Amino acid sequence: MTTPEGAMYVAWEDLTVVIPNFGEGATKRLLNGVNGCGEPNRILAIMGPSGSGKSTLLDALAGRLAGNVVMSGKVLVNGKKRRLDFGAAAYVTQEDVLLGTLTVRESISYSAHLRLPSKLTREEISDIVEATITDMGLEECSDRTIGNWHLRGISGGEKKRLSIALEVLTKPSLLFLDEPTSGLDSASAFFVVQILRNIASSGKTVVSSIHQPSGEVFALFDDLLLLSGGETVYFGEAESATKFFGEAGFPCPSRRNPSDHFLRCVNSDFDNVTAALVESRRINDSSFSLHQLHETTNTLDPLDDIPTAEIRTTLVRKFKCSLYAAASRARIQEIASIVGIVTERKKGSQTNWWKQLRILTQRSFINMSRDLGYYWMRIAVYIVLSICVGSIFFNVGRNHTNVMSTAACGGFMAGFMTFMSIGGFQSFIEEMKVFSRERLNGHYGVAVYTVSNLLSSLPFIILMCLSTSSITIYMVRFQSGGSHFFYNCLDLICAITTVESCMMMIASVVPNFLMGVMLGAGYIGIMVLSAGFFRFFPDLPMVFWRYPVSYINYGAWALQGAYKNEMIGVEYDSPLPLVPKMKGELILQTVLGINPESSKWLDLAVVMMILIGYRIAFFAILKFREKVFPVIHMLYTKRTLSHIQKRPSFRRMTPFPSRRYPVHHALSSQEGLNSPLH
């Protein structure tokens, strides 16, 4: 079989995903030998109760499984093994990760400029953006803000359509969606799936998990993969699923939504709810029975008399030996053996690096300027603290008794002011979420993000440092003059930028805000402690604290430069009469342990080098996760599978859990059930 140009056929065979347990317990199977395929012009719906493995299957197909799970089996695209992350396929996650300060039109426009070919004119890109807005039904909310913690935004259905719009801009041949109708009302859910129907009709392959669709939504699906407990209950054409359930002895009643019936047959939560209701009634009436519960609730559903585990096991067994399974296996084999046109691995973006840098910097700057919690609140706090510092150290003077006051003021500026950068960690975490989503979908590269993040934050850091330095220098009466003011500002800018680079590096490795704040606060605390203010450099323990910590400490170099900038060339009054004034250079050397012969610009250069080092480390961490981690995980998977496959508990299937119940009969022969098949 040969594929049409641009079409993507995806097939998976014997897909098993497990969470290894190297102790005495059994290994947990998230997926167990699942087979299936997705084709152009068709929507494949992956259905099942919560915990059935829907999201796990999508993550396995898209190459986004967590690091603590291992996968076996084959995933083939047009007959070849290939990775489907970083732009090869689009993936709309269940969580709508968006920049809440942008409008709908701005979000789509920036994404279009980041990814569409550079040869397109601005007018052509604008036409594509407007067409996408129209196709997704976003005209009414196109100029409204998406919304965040302080801005009211668009509805959940509009956010979901926007998430889909961002991924279909470049017309990907393969689209994955994780529960796109979750949390939506029936009308919004139908509209979203109708959009997917239109996308599939244009020759695209759409694979979507869905929890419990309405009858109207279910009718839009071409194929159905029904999962329960990580196993396949049914795979084939969606319209044939009702017939299979009827042939298996569990026909769908005429007035019931087919998807509701399918989930009722395989969802064990119904048994748990029934058992809980019976137990609660027995507390007041010891003779209360399950039959009485059915009578009091007026239910005529014969499924209530049969444990769900038995129904599920029967369906799984009957599907494996059914004609539906044989037909699906033949189709999967046909798709897996495709020859001819093989889709080349391509990037999700088709524009050049410099345009991406400009657009991404502009978008990030706008986001920072509109988010009050990113920089504006911190700038306000910095101004208030600067006024407090200025009033406490007001006109500190040049008396010998004020030498330590000058050092304390400089230490506070270099220490606590940089420590305040941790206040923006929540914004860093949110930005990293957006980056992770866009990077996995191939919107842009790691290098352009690393540089653009630095460039977009600089104007706010400069404003922050200018306001802080202007207030403190004027009120404390530090050395006046353009060069001293310029150095003071530049020293503070470099120190704060270095800390923010460190925070971004931490945000790239920690999973949540709390862990990031703990690590960031601990790290900055160590840097402040060894910066040379709380204990001067000559008094620091030589092992570890002096060498090497103080030499790789941005705070130590920034504080040295600040002391030199203030004290060199200044004379302090002597404590004794007729004794010459003390030079600032002498105080630097004898009291603070700082070599005055070393240029303050050298200290600033070292801070800049540490800043660059943090940015390179940030880049290296992101690249490691992208390039090296998959290789390490592949080796881990091979070794883990070879280990757990030797265990009898892994090879042995879970025993039938409900032997105490009587053997059930076909529901079509039971009284009170009206099946549309008869």
From Swiss-Prot:
The segment(s) forming the ABC transmembrane type-2 domain are 355-567
List of residues binding ATP: G48, P49, S50, G51, S52, G53, K54, S55
Q: What induces it?
A: By NaCl.
User: What's a Gene Ontology MF term here?
Assistant: ATP binding
Which gene is the coding source of this polypeptide chain?
A: ABCG13
* Membership in a protein family: Belongs to the ABC transporter superfamily. ABCG family. Eye pigment precursor importer (TC 3.A.1.204) subfamily.
Keywords of the record, alphabetical order, are: ATP-binding, Membrane, Nucleotide-binding, Phosphoprotein, Transmembrane, Transmembrane helix, Transport
In this protein, which residues make up the domain named ABC transporter?
10-254
Question: Phosphoserine: which positions carry it?
Answer: S658
* Location in the cell: Membrane
Q: How does it sit in the membrane?
A: Multi-pass membrane protein
Membrane-spanning intervals of the chain: 374-394, 409-429, 446-466, 490-510, 513-533, 602-622
Recorded hits in InterPro entries, A to Z, give: AAA+_ATPase, ABC2_TM, ABC_transporter-like_ATP-bd, ABC_transporter-like_CS, ABCG_dom, P-loop_NTPase, Plant_ABCG
Species in which this protein is naturally found: Arabidopsis thaliana
Q: What is this protein called?
A: ABC transporter G family member 13
GO CC terms for this protein?
membrane; plasmodesma
What is the predominant subcellular site recorded for this chain?
A: membrane
GO BP, one annotated term:
petal epidermis patterning
Which Pfam families would you find in this protein's record? ABC2_membrane, ABC2_membrane_7, ABC_tran
